[in-house]
UniProtKB/Swiss-Prot annotation:
Function (record text): ATP-binding RNA helicase involved in ribosome assembly.
Entries under InterPro entries matching the protein: DEAD/DEAH_box_helicase_dom (IPR011545), DEAD_box_RNA_helicase (IPR050079), Helicase_ATP-bd (IPR014001), Helicase_C-like (IPR001650), P-loop_NTPase (IPR027417), RNA-helicase_DEAD-box_CS (IPR000629), RNA_helicase_DEAD_Q_motif (IPR014014)
Gene Ontology molecular-function annotations: ATP binding; ATP hydrolysis activity; RNA binding; RNA helicase activity
Protein name: ATP-dependent RNA helicase DRS1
Coiled coil: 586-666
Amino acid sequence: MAKNEDLILTIDSDAEYDNISESSEEEAEEAVSVKSKKKNNNNNNNKKSKAGKHGKANLEEAEAEEDDDEARGEMNLDFQFSLGDDLNEIKDWEVEEPAKDIDLNEIIKKKRESKKDGNGDDEEDDGDEDEDASESEEDDEKEELKAAGKNGQAGDDDEDENEDEDEEEEVDTKEDLDNFYESQETNTSASALKSKTFQELQLSRPILKSLQQLGFTVPTPVQASTIPIALLGKDIVASAQTGSGKTAAYLIPIIERLLYVKNSTSTKAIILTPTRELAIQVHDVGRKLGQFVSNLNFGMAVGGLSLKQQEQQLKTRPDIVIATPGRLIDHIRNSPSFSVEDVQVLIIDEADRMLEEGFQEELTEILSLIPKQKRQTLLFSATMNNTKIQDLVQLSLNKPIKVSIDPPRTVASKLEQQFVRIRKREELKPAVLYLLLKKLEGRTVVFTRTKVEAHKLRIILGLLGLTVAELHGALTQEQRLANVKAFKNNVNVLICTDLAARGLDIRIEYVINYDMPKTYEIYTHRVGRTARAGRKGTSISFVGESMQDRNIVKNAIQFNSRSVARKIDWDEVEKIQTKIKLNEGAIEEVIEEEKQAREIMRAEMQLNKAENLMKYEKEIKSRPKRTWFKSEVMEHLTKHGKKVNAKKRKANEERKEEGKERSYKKTKADRTKLKTKAKSSSKKRK
């Protein structure tokens, strides 16, 4: 099979992970040199013939997989990124972490081999779970699923009550909100936009040429709705289903706008994303869409990659900067050659995800640095029924136009949702997961609630003989990219937390919810990793006894009829559970061995750091101290480095507002006098 077939056919693909991760393993000898815009233009032109060859091959592969379903007309399936291209500005970057790391696979392999020597052959017979499944179990689960579908309205009533409570807390009335938004509102169904083409959107030739070469001819609904409004310079609040092509929906109008801006050495557009991986994908898509535009430069400001190299790149004042919120603020404050004074367009991608990750303060700080009167703002969010989202919209946008494409709370039409009733058998979940993974053929993403659980599952499955990768916040940037590369190339199972729920754009056949998410919205984000662009996909969810899990199942059945109970051979599960219990000692040994190796590595890092501090002491001390906006706020609110609790902080703020702030510090004598006065006044009252 051709390597290109592994990628999903949407414009949001992350085709360049191979090149990034390969380069991150090598130490860069020099910092990124300052490139002129002319040189960048030549580099883009050198890629034309290469992209053309891959575009033709990908077009033929996409046509071979065409389906007659209506959904195929709604999504563009003629486009596919090529794995042969390079990321000019990222491939030689260093990662912030050292290349040295613990080889967990080797530790697991040794433990597995030692277990085999001690216990003999542990190979199990796969069996046929569909034939051996308990019929009574299946009937019970089917009846419960039917009942859940019938009682779906009851779940909605509960949600309506919660919504009423939220509405009571809000200060703004419906009339105020209506006045805040522009009168024009776009709420479009996919079928209404089938006939639209990019030519009808009146885009410039360089953009049309790049779209044509990439095989991208028919815009998705969100692109057809958003691009014309964005080209008018209006602010936009867009809500669309995950994987609907929103990356191109905001990149195309930005590039179109920059075509008519006179050459200037300043950054004109900033794109904010919640994760580094998504920022890398957006950078890749933008570079491909702008390959025929003269002197168009892209920059990145994300955590995990070398800070110095990013500073060198930002010195060139790239036209478009893709960033994560924290690193962008760091560069604005501490990189002297980088400025946001001339920014004309601000994109907030996956705003709901940013707020979930706790970036509210960072977003507020960025918005204060780029006043909304000077910029056009496009905000994209998968969900809008959130008070924090509404607050962010009012803070960041000026008379925005709403664009709502898909009906809320829906999942892809070709997704089959399967549910496994766990009941009170939580301890059997690893065994059930192993049984499923042995049966499934194709790439599978397993979602867990915590990174500790994800890591432990990797060890358990590894000791049982499965090769799996993990992706979560406890990993370094180098480890993340290496694991994504492995998942794309030779590993079929990726265990991850919600970090990757909206960051991966690799073709995935199965999504397993090992732990059910907290909300139905997060559930839709997770299962949205499969059944994309009109393809078929399957989600399998382990459902517990909590009301939270039950409500998610009710909503899933109500909004998608393709929901079934999956049959499980519980006798086979019990056998696998016995093996897992026998491996409990080995699991603890692997965790302990990994912990010791990590401590040794950390000690070596501290030693190297101390040596560097001594060796380069003068150079380090001569550098200006890096600042952070939160530190300055706390420094302003505290005295002599002492922490101020919320009660004292509020009292200090009230004194300032009333003009009663003390101009001196109370002495011991002052406090004694106050106590004496208080006692005398209390005696008089008596």
